[in-house]
Regions:
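Conserved RNA-binding domains used in RNP assembly and mRNA/RNA metabolism
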Residues: 1-94
């Protein structure tokens, strides 16, 4: 999982897993944006483009200002939201 912050020309900071990075575009999955929380000083996360049906979104790089690493706390929160939970294939006998 490659969690990055993507700053769009529109001013949005999108946090997503970048699954492919080419010279012309990036392909992301599970994109979210930070939104103000009712509690002062806190933020919450909301889906970016929640009406899309696709699992992967291709973004042309001409609409991207920069791509960077989010703060470690943001990465951990993202991974807890979208990380795959692996379960053992065999049952343990206790």
């Amino acid at each position: 999982m490659t969690v990055k912050l993507v700053r769009m020309w529109s001013g949005e900071d999108v946090i997503a897993d970048i699954v492919e990075d080419t010279s012309d575009s990036i392909i992301i999955t599970d994109p979210i944006v930070a939104v103000p929380s009712p509690q002062q000083g806190n933020i919450a996360f909301a889906p970016w483009s929640p009406l899309l049906q696709k699992d992967k979104i291709e973004i042309t790089k001409k609409y991207v200002v920069y791509i960077g690493d989010p703060q470690e706390e943001i990465i951990e929160q993202y991974k807890s939201m979208f990380g795959k939970i692996s379960t053992p294939t065999k049952k343990l006998i206790l």
